[in-house]
From Swiss-Prot:
The gene is cdhB. Part of a complex that catalyzes the reversible cleavage of acetyl-CoA, allowing autotrophic growth from CO(2). The alpha-epsilon subcomponent functions as a carbon monoxide dehydrogenase. The precise role of the epsilon subunit is unclear; it may have a stabilizing role within the alpha(2)epsilon(2) component and/or be involved in electron transfer to FAD during a potential FAD-mediated CO oxidation. Coiled coil: none annotated. It holds the Pfam family CO_dh. HAMAP family: CdhB (MF_01134). The modification Blocked amino end (Met) is found at residue 1. NCBIfam families: cdhB (TIGR00315). This is Acetyl-CoA decarbonylase/synthase complex subunit epsilon. Belongs to the CdhB family.
Length: 187
């Protein structure tokens, strides 16, 4: 018997930094519903999905990211997360790159991207250790305002433009929210 799929997860609740030391100043991320985030990603000209090793803590997320990759979104697999894609036999549009070099490249508007086709307009983050993701998002917030920073992570990320509220303690709601993002991308 299949588990009941939740719909209409309110990802706008609990918009406080997951770690209280991560207060960036007057400009903090806004929380959005999954369908809005999905629509933004769908309309992006050059989206990039950046994933990290925390996906191994929740392996079903690899399958969800592969689903996004099959929609034509290139995947930057940081740390050793590339192994999750290799193990599933999916390497199309998957690029292995360190988080810090990627952050450095993304700072520059004239960077040609992982595929040589140009800079990205929307960068989507998830599965990266909270402190690393916060640093990456902060760098982009302060050094390249042309990129829309979107987090579909289980944590509220203060330096993103768009994020979920904290869903870290409710994996079912988090999975449902990501499923809603993917469904909105298909419309």
């Amino acid at each position: 018997m299949a588990a009941e799929v939740k719909k209409g997860i309110d990802t706008t609740k609990n918009p406080i930094p997951f770690e209280m030391a991560q207060i960036p100043g007057p400009e903090m991320a806004k929380t959005y519903l999954p369908k809005v985030i999905g629509a933004i990603i769908r309309k992006a000209k050059r989206p990039l999905l950046v994933v990290g090793a925390e996906l191994f803590d929740d392996p079903v997320m690899f399958d969800k990211m592969i689903e996004m990759g099959k929609m034509g979104i290139p995947i930057a697999a940081t740390a050793h997360s590339v192994k999750g894609f290799v193990d599933r036999g999916y390497l199309e549009n998957v690029y292995q790159i360190g988080l810090h070099p990627l952050t450095n490249f993304l700072r520059f508007p004239d960077w040609k991207g992982l595929d040589g086709q140009g800079q990205y307009d929307v960068v989507i983050f998830l599965g990266i250790y909270y402190k690393f993701a916060n640093g990456m998002l902060s760098t982009l917030k302060n050094f390249n305002r042309d990129i829309k920073r979107v987090s579909i992570d289980r944590y509220y990320h203060v330096n993103a433009d768009m994020t979920f509220g904290n869903l870290a303690f409710n994996p079912d709601d988090y999975h449902a929210a990501v499923d809603e993002v993917i469904a909105a991308m298909k419309k």
